[in-house]
Structures are given as structure tokens and as C-alpha cells.
């Protein structure tokens, strides 16, 4: 999982 949530 990435540090930033791109699934927003």
C-alpha cells in the first residue's frame, strides 16, 4: 500500500 491514498 502506498503512503498516500490515491483512491479518493
Curated annotation (Swiss-Prot):
Query: Where does the UniProt annotation locate this protein?
Result: Cytoplasm, Cytoskeleton
Keywords from the UniProt entry? ATP-binding, Cytoplasm, Cytoskeleton, Nucleotide-binding
Question: Any idea which GO molecular function terms this record carries?
Answer: ATP binding
A single GO cellular-component term from the record reads: cytoplasm
- Highest taxon of the source? Eukaryota
Keyword Cytoplasm applies: yes
Does this UniProt record's set of keywords contain Ribosomal protein?
no
Relate the protein's function as given in its record: Actins are highly conserved proteins that are involved in various types of cell motility and are ubiquitously expressed in all eukaryotic cells.
Give the family, as the similarity comment puts it: Belongs to the actin family.
Note, other: On the 2D-gel the determined pI of this protein is: 6.8, its MW is: 46 kDa.
Q: What is this protein called?
A: Actin
Q: What is the lineage of its organism?
A: Eukaryota, Metazoa, Ecdysozoa, Arthropoda, Crustacea
Amino acid at each position: 500500500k502506498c503512503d498516500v491514498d490515491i483512491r479518493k
